[in-house]
């Protein structure tokens, strides 16, 4: 009859007895269309009134629930195990979501919780003993890095995070906060690469906070990258001079160290930082560690620059990502930007002194908007412009734009027709920036072999890494050569180039070199040095002891 349902209605299941006895509406477990059923009374008669236009939820029979659930689980697991594509897609999804390869829960390694707690202790010690201050603003970056490391250790899903780099150099700190010097640009590029490869990077300021970090997680530390003077302090620290050394490092107090006062690993202090894990940042070509060039990190490939083919470990840097943000202009200012940070560069070691003005005046004017515009040379050397727009006067009629922020300088470079070197600064990143934005570089040749003047292997130039790069990208001019400089300026002013990034400045290559630094067995390499170079002399065994001592 209308408004009621019989027990034979296949679309109706009774509520459980406890529901009827409760005498109130209960939401059943199953979704069954757009009606639901309520008892008309609590008299025990199973007579239901259909209420329409309201969603109907129906509770299936209790005995069928466990069976249905079990069946569903079996079917799901059977399908997942038997279909590789399903497994692959699930793994891909997890990898995509997490950014790292997930490990199953049953693969949790014993001791991960203990290791995570040790990292927590380290974080607490650093925050208490070496907090982030105005003088050490990058230390607060460590807290997030350590939290990330703790999380992956606890869940046993670390990839490269468990491989730690300690950076004890003002250039890492300067690069992190936007420093524009050559060393800072290099360090920032290294830091970006280390992070992109998912290694853990920790900032330190001196040899004692570096030692504290190392001693808490020695097996995780793959490399300690030092500033030369800090490495020297670590080596020198002993029971008689430690107080004097600490006096020079106000932000790296070492009073926490009890017992023997030391920093570097030795037979008397085996818990110290190993030589073979210690690498030194060095902008120039000479090795600065007892283990030689492979433990001296350099921004340029000196094995290809030096006449004898000797070199340090080339890490290099890449400005590829950042310079690609800037436009390559078809129309440029009819001017050349002189590469010089300080006014003194125009008087000290200026290889074009006295001829810059003459060479400038020899460049033909450009026609812009129907008018002839003379070629000019400009510079950003010196102080910022005063309120009235004045700044230092520069020789030979060179226009001073005044010191400017990095972004503004880069735009000025991008709109120039050439970048002109006069001798200093050496190995600056600016020529690379210019080439990447389509601006050629005039590279001054400061020295050459008189009997073989065209042999570039024996040239000494302002930017030696570019001395093999040909025109129209790089114009090489001998110092004091007015004709050569005039001709180079004219060709550069009238020959447009597109973006040019040397192969060794590519990001992909730099990442591979950072991987090599992090993945090489440097203990084995150091043992070879001790055996071959030092002939296993006992006094050099501390460079790579027979017992590694880093676990």
Where would I find each of the regions flagged by the language model?
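Short acidic, S/G/P-rich loop/turn micro-motifs used as interaction or catalytic elements
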Residues: 171-182, 209-210, 229-236, 240-241, ...
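N-terminal signal-anchor transmembrane helix specifying type II single-pass membrane topology
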Residues: 15, 19, 23-101
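Catalytic binding pocket for nucleotide-activated donors in carbohydrate/polymer assembly enzymes
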Residues: 417-516, 531
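Catalytic core of nucleotide-activated saccharide and alditol-phosphate transferases
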Residues: 219-350
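Well-ordered, non-membrane alpha-helical segments in soluble/globular domains
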Residues: 180-190, 348-366, 483-490, 511-520
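Short alpha-helical donor nucleotide-sugar binding micro-motif in glycosyltransferases
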Residues: 412-416
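Conserved catalytic-core segment of nucleotide-activated headgroup transferases in glycan assembly
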Residues: 177-183, 307-410
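N-terminal pre-catalytic "stem/leader" segment of glycosyltransferase-like enzymes
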Residues: 37, 60-64, 78-235, 516-551
């Amino acid at each position: 009859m209308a408004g009621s349902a019989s027990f034979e209605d296949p679309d109706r299941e009774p509520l459980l007895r406890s529901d009827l006895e409760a005498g109130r509406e209960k939401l059943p477990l199953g979704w069954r269309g757009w009606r639901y059923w309520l008892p008309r009374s609590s008299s025990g008669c199973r007579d239901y009134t259909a209420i329409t236009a309201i969603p109907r939820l129906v509770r299936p029979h209790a005995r069928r629930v466990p069976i249905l659930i079990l069946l569903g689980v079996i079917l799901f697991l059977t399908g997942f195990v038997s279909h590789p594509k399903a497994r692959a897609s699930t793994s891909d999804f997890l990898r995509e979501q997490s950014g790292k390869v997930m490990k199953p829960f049953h693969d949790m390694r014993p001791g991960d919780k203990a290791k995570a707690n040790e990292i927590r202790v380290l974080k607490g010690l650093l925050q208490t003993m070496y907090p982030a201050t105005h003088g050490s603003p990058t230390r607060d970056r460590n807290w997030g890095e350590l939290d990330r490391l703790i999380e992956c250790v606890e869940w046993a899903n670390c990839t490269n995070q468990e491989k730690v780099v300690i950076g004890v150099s003002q250039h890492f700190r300067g690069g992190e906060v936007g420093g524009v010097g050559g060393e800072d640009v290099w360090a920032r590029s290294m830091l970006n690469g280390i992070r992109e490869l998912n290694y853990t990077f920790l900032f330190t300021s001196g040899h004692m906070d570096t030692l504290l970090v190392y001693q808490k997680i020695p097996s995780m530390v793959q490399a300690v990258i030092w500033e030369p003077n800090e490495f020297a302090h670590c080596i020198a620290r002993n029971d008689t001079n430690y107080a004097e050394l600490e006096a020079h490092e106000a932000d790296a107090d070492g009073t926490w160290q009890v017992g023997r006062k030391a920093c570097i690993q030795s037979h008397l202090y085996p818990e110290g930082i190993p030589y073979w894990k210690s690498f030194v940042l060095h902008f120039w070509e000479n090795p600065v560690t007892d283990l030689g060039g492979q433990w001296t990190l350099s921004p340029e490939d000196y094995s290809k620059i030096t006449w004898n083919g000797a070199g340090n470990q080339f890490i290099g840097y890449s400005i590829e990502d950042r310079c690609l943000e800037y436009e390559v202009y078809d129309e440029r200012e009819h001017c050349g930007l002189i590469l010089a940070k300080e006014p003194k560069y125009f008087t000290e070691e200026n290889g074009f002194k006295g001829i810059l003005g003459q060479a400038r005046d020899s460049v033909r004017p450009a026609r812009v908007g129907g008018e002839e515009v003379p070629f000019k040379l400009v510079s950003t050397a010196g102080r910022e412009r005063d309120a009235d727009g004045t700044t230092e006067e520069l020789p030979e009629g060179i226009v001073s734009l005044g010191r400017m922020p990095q972004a503004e300088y880069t735009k000025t470079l991008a709109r120039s027709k050439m970048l002109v070197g006069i001798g200093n600064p050496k190995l600056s990143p600016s020529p690379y920036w210019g080439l990447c934005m389509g601006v050629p570089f005039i590279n001054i040749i400061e020295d050459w072999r008189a009997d073989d003047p065209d042999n570039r292997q024996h040239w000494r130039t302002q930017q030696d890494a570019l001395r093999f790069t040909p025109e129209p990208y790089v114009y090489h001019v001998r110092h004091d050569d007015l004709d050569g400089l005039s001709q180079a300026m004219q060709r550069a002013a009238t020959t447009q180039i597109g973006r040019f990034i040397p192969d060794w400045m590519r990001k992909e290559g730099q990442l591979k070199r950072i991987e090599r630094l992090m993945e090489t067995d440097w203990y084995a390499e150091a043992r070879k040095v001790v055996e071959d170079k030092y002939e296993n002399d006992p006094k050099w065994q501390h460079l790579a002891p027979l017992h590694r001592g880093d676990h």
